């Protein structure tokens, strides 16, 4: 995920190497020497960025990719959504950032995989600026199918050749076999 008002300042945020569901616990040296060095703290897995000056910032957010099954010919899960927007931010405003990470293999690595995490950029207590959904996990595939990628609407994709479940709607999770919404 990157934030920058052209061309003076550019901040690229990462998941800080975290693979845990709770997110990162510290910045470490991840941003040392970068434009946002010293402007970011972490609280409860959320990165808190203090805006350095008032201006228009271009924010690009990408959701985490899904994982793939052990026997999958393609070695990629569904792609996370990529969203870009311009926002007026105020000096010393706190922007809360959660960068989604890649999904994981399940306990039976041949048949289960996880979807990627969403990337969230919010101001104040929880006013969304950009939210980019993560891509779906893929069991066994021989070619890429767009139904496994994140959706840019408020309804998630069902997946490729999926009769067992459905995509989520309006922020609610999707259904699985025996647990279909509706």
Segments predicted by a language model, with ranges:
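Homeobox/homeodomain signature
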Residues: 3, 39-41, 73, 79, ...
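Extracellular, modular beta-sheet/disulfide-rich ectodomains of secreted and cell-surface proteins
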Residues: 1-68, 116, 127-128, 136-142, ...
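Activation on beta-sandwich/Ig-like modules and their edge loops
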Residues: 63-79
């Amino acid at each position: 995920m990157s934030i920058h008002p052209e061309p003076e300042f550019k901040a690229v945020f990462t998941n800080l190497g975290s693979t845990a569901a709770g997110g990162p616990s510290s910045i470490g040296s991840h941003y040392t020497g970068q434009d946002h060095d010293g402007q970011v703290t972490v609280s409860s897995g959320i990165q808190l960025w203090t805006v350095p000056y008032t201006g228009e910032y271009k924010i690009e957010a990408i959701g985490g990719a899904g994982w793939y099954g052990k026997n999958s010919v393609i070695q990629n899960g569904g792609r996370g959504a990529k969203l870009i927007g311009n926002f007026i931010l105020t000096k010393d405003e706190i922007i809360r950032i959660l960068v989604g990470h890649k999904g994981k293999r399940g306990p039976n690595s041949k048949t289960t995989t996880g979807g990627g995490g969403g990337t969230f950029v919010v101001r104040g207590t929880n006013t969304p600026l950009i939210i980019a959904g993560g891509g779906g996990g893929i069991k066994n595939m021989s070619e890429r199918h767009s139904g496994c990628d994140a959706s840019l609407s408020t309804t998630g994709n069902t997946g490729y050749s999926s009769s067992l479940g459905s995509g989520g709607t309006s922020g609610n999770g999707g259904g699985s076999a025996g647990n279909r919404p509706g």
